[in-house]
Amino acid sequence: MSEDQGQQGQRLSTARGSTCLKQTMTEPALSAGLGTDGPVGAAKDNIRVRIQSRRRSRLLSRLGRKIPTQGRFTVGWYFWFLLIYTSLAVEPVKSHETHSHSSDAEGTSHQDVSDRRNHPCHTPRPSSHSQADSFESVARGQQKEQSRTMREDAVSPVLLDVKRSQSTPVELAKLVSLKLSTSFGSRTVIRRSQPGVRQSVRAAQLQRMMLDRGNPKRERSSGSSTPSSKSSPVDSVSTAPTSVSPGSLAPSGSTNNDPASGFKHIDSQADLPERPLSPVRESPMVSPTIQTTEATAIVKVFLETHFHTLLSGLDARTQRRLELDQYIETFPLSPEEVVRVRKHWVTQERDYLRQYRVLKSRPQDKTSRAGTASLAGFEPLKILGRGSFGVVRLVREKRTDEQTQSGRVPLAPKTNHRQAMTGVKKDVFAMKVIRKSVMIRNCQEAHLRAERDFLVASAKSRWVVPLIASFQDQKHLYLVMDYMVGGDFLGLLIRHNILRESIARWYVAEMILCIEEAHRLRCIHRDVKPDNFLISESGHLKISDFGLAFDGHWAHDQWYFTYQRHSLLKRLGIQIDGDAEDQKLSHDANIQSLGTTREDGSMEDDWIHPPTNGLLHWRDKNQTRTMARSVVGTSQYMAPEVIRGHPYDGRCDWWSLGVILYECLYGFTPFASEDRHQTKLKIHRHLQTLYFPVHRPTDKLVSADAIDVINSLLQEKEFRLSSPKYKQNDAISSKPAKCSFYKPDSSNPSYQGHYVYPDDATDIKSHRFFRGINWEQIHRTSPPFIPMVRGWEDTRYFDDGEHPSDREDDSSDSELDGVQDKWHPLGGKGGLHKPDKPLKADVKPSSYPKGNDGAKDTAIASLKHKKRLKEAKRARDKILRDKRLRRTVLEMLRCLVVVAAT
């Protein structure tokens, strides 16, 4: 049967080949008969035949075939025979065994076709329904075979979906084009610097697995799945294959003999087997550390405060430009002068940005403070005062050689006689050098941010010491302030003991304007005392040291910074042991690491669970404090509501003003005692303890108006002389502790946050004691005292600057567990103590002079140079009291302070 079928197929192929040959031979004759007559037509036919023969020869030469040239119709016959052979006598490409490859087409006959069809491994021609799939699979597989094989001969013929009918020129063009593009097209080679397995390998493996599942009865052999042949110039590959071939995915040593295994097509992903993916290898779970917690807290604080500043619309450069425009509109300047002024402004802005970038980009000196100051353009000269938080230095702006030669920076005159420095060019400044470690241990991040923000806001104020520059290094913060050559007002009191009533009236009037300016900027000073009023070169007063100032902003609340750290520690499960006292308390009372009370109010659920969307708006609405509660300040000048821990407002500053006026007229504070505890008890019972001495001659010189204004200021806040605007706060203060977050009525035209109101000294100014004071022109009047120095570097008014003080700061039970000193800019020191802890350092009334002869009492002289014994300091944050973590946390928290002061 097989022989009969082979002979029948041979006869069928021969018949079809002869038919095609006859058609090819008769085409020129037909065209010659139909086209032209005579020898001219015959010549044209011969030319046409030669052109066709040359085209076919070039085509076949590109296909790698050698063309016989005998006879006129040999080329056409050979071409059509090759086409018939390709369409009828082709077997599919097999990926499961090695085939014998055909040689060149020269000498091919119909007997070869018959032998191929009689081959035992020959597969019948697939049906027309699967011809498209077979063609697509063959083309894909053949491309992969060519890219994988390094050197290979001509590839076995591919089964094409061509009909057995007579071919037309269009079909012939499609056939040749497809043959050239699929079999002998140009190869694309992708070169990678680091060759690796592609992501498509897994998909190819899944397809292979799907094929294996569909043919369970496949026979396996040890032969190679890729046909091998001799090298051919057409199929030679210069580099390793970059694509994945189907045969390369099969396991080594096992191949499939099913001829259709390489042609199965997966139409959709639904045919893929549903198998669970292998788990991805990951690094082992890492336990969170304190470094992670602190870094996260620092980033959160920075992002929230930074974007709050951006969204608030407070652009300093825009404000300066608006001020420039206002200046140009105010003065009648010519167009040339306007251009010159604008160019000068642009130059200043450019220089500022350049210096800012230099300070940001250059590495800071970790050990030398002089190196950092020099980098910022300042040269340290001498020390003005010392404090527990740092030191105040007199610095001079560095001059360049060009400025010195051109005379742009005139030098201050150096003389041997003292003179007033009014109108003389100032080239020196006072620079605060604050130690970060001390600030962090005392939890002063929020206070430092509040001080800097207020100084920036008060840059154009007449009554506030202006901030010139601020920068930092790894260990210190630097605030460059304007230099007040006259020293502080406390030094003036020490030198003169008691002031005459007219002089005291003038200075207290300027103090009122200073405090009122701070309230106009929505800030409660909370540390009003003689130390914080500085005397300028003209003799007028300016207020300074806003380290304890309160403005209600959530970013100026120390609890906000503490909560960021402790909440993360609680979520991550990091245990904080603290020191021995903390461990004892935790063991006895089972106290959590995070306290249940906060600095300025109770810890509510809203604080513990802030929203994820609209966080900044939520903080502005819910965490902006409308009343202050912290027990801060200097004990002798603290108001009774502050000592009691009740909610208070800006009226506490006017109480301190009454104490200062009393001290100016009598030489000592009204509630001075041997220790702070007794001082606070006297303030608490001020109605019984306040008295006005009359046994000295100077006491009789105090007028009744002065006594009345002092008595009106030293009252409970509901009856204190200030402004009627605060009356609405009295109802709020009678509510529970949550009133510090009371939502006020913003419809009030004078609303500023309820804790402070602008122009809140109307009742004080209208008192008869200040009759004759021109409040609008007082800054133009001649002051009672004008400092006389030999030059800007003369610091005679600061040599006596070690004044005793008992300043307190944030004695909340949730944060304060020990005694802390607080720094002030002129060398005074103060401690921070609990209200019920007795301490020494208050000044007795008997220590002050008993007469008006101007002699200095020996007790005051000894107090100026006395060094108070420092008690052992205990960090206020439990994390900083832990011996295992405090060093690491302290180093990381320095970055937080840097962000706050930059």
UniProtKB/Swiss-Prot annotation:
Binding site for ATP: 384-392, 432
Region (Disordered): 1-22, 97-154, 207-288, 797-875
Cystine bridges: none
Pfam families the UniProt entry points to: Pkinase (PF00069)
GO MF, one example: protein serine kinase activity
Reaction catalysis annotation: L-seryl-[protein] + ATP = O-phospho-L-seryl-[protein] + ADP + H(+); L-threonyl-[protein] + ATP = O-phospho-L-threonyl-[protein] + ADP + H(+)
Gene Ontology BP terms: intracellular signal transduction
EC number: 2.7.11.1
Comp. bias regions, Polar residues: 125-134, 240-259
Domain Protein kinase: 378-732
Keywords for this protein: ATP-binding, Kinase, Nucleotide-binding, Serine/threonine-protein kinase, Transferase
Class of the enzyme per the UniProt entry, highest EC level: transferase
Acidic residues bias (residue ranges): 807-818
Residue spans of biased composition, Low complexity class: 222-239
Family per record: Belongs to the protein kinase superfamily. STE Ser/Thr protein kinase family. COT1 subfamily.
Known role: Protein kinase that seems to play a role in the regulation of cell morphogenesis and proliferation.
Protein name: Serine/threonine-protein kinase cbk1
Organism: Emericella nidulans (strain FGSC A4 / ATCC 38163 / CBS 112.46 / NRRL 194 / M139) (Aspergillus nidulans)
Lineage of the species this protein comes from: Eukaryota, Fungi, Dikarya, Ascomycota, Pezizomycotina
Encoding gene per record: cbk1
